[in-house]
Amino acid sequence: MRLIPLETTSDVAFWSARYISDAINKYSPTKERPFVLGLPTGGTPLETYKRLIALYNKGEVSFENVVTFNMDEYVGLEQEHPQSYYRFMHQNFFSQIDIQIENTHLLNGLADDLEAECLRYEKKIKSYGKINLFIGGVGADGHIAFNEPASSLASRTRVKTLASNTRRANSRFFNNDINQVPKLALTIGVGTLLEAAEILILVTGHHKAQALEAAIQGNVNHLWTVTALQLHPKTIIACDAASTMELKVKTLKYFSELESDNIGYL
């Protein structure tokens, strides 16, 4: 696992956007051989999306031959609901780049048969071989997508009951009313994530410090979903200074020295 320790949230957004655009350009995608990108929602990736849009506007990256799969979606929200992830992605990213809308894939939280929808999503991912690069964030309790603590590390895309802590944290998007936050969501599984060729996780803020410590210094266990990343051969975590507060000084020094050339990538 690689850790890229940066200073600010803006640095994480800039670094990750540049890394993603470089990965796409290096792959040289075509219609017959698209670059497959896994995407999250939320405040942390929002800044990365803004940077990617800026790179697109400068002509430094194209999404014409990129296929995307989002991590998760609430159950029961209409696509145009202000807090649906469908609306988030179209409003904050897809509508501002040259991606083909038919190449964007999101779980349908309104499907009549939710389990069948999850199976369909898994099959769709497999139809492209694998996801080339999966971007993700992490919750304060270490969850990735909606894989809450105690999720199976071999799990696949499925219906998931949201933990109270997650619903409470997300209530800020629902007028601070936890009763408006859906109790169920569709999410890719940990096993689904680990099948990606490469994973890039964005971690920012002091409230994510325990999760980062678990990911880097902890043992693999199902109560901290983020620790599953230790099992992946090509994971990168880009983080800001605030999120490193729980790391040992020697750990942070080790990665800072090891990645000094890549930190200079900014």
Curated annotation (Swiss-Prot):
The active site is at D72, D141, H143, E148. The record marks S151, R158, K160, T161, Y254 as: Part of the allosteric site. Its EC number is 3.5.99.6. InterPro entries: Glc/Gal-6P_isomerase (IPR006148), Glucosamine6P_isomerase (IPR004547), Glucosamine6P_isomerase_CS (IPR018321), NagB/RpiA_transferase-like (IPR037171). Allosterically activated by N-acetylglucosamine 6-phosphate (GlcNAc6P). GO terms for cellular component: cytoplasm. GO terms for biological process: carbohydrate metabolic process; glucosamine catabolic process; N-acetylglucosamine catabolic process; N-acetylneuraminate catabolic process. Keywords: Allosteric enzyme, Carbohydrate metabolism, Hydrolase. Coiled coil: none annotated. One of its GO terms (molecular function) is glucosamine-6-phosphate deaminase activity. Pathway: Amino-sugar metabolism; N-acetylneuraminate degradation; D-fructose 6-phosphate from N-acetylneuraminate: step 5/5. CDD domains: GlcN6P_deaminase. It catalyses: alpha-D-glucosamine 6-phosphate + H2O = beta-D-fructose 6-phosphate + NH4(+). Catalyzes the reversible isomerization-deamination of glucosamine 6-phosphate (GlcN6P) to form fructose 6-phosphate (Fru6P) and ammonium ion. Homohexamer. Belongs to the glucosamine/galactosamine-6-phosphate isomerase family. NagB subfamily. This is Glucosamine-6-phosphate deaminase. It comes from Psychromonas ingrahamii (strain DSM 17664 / CCUG 51855 / 37).
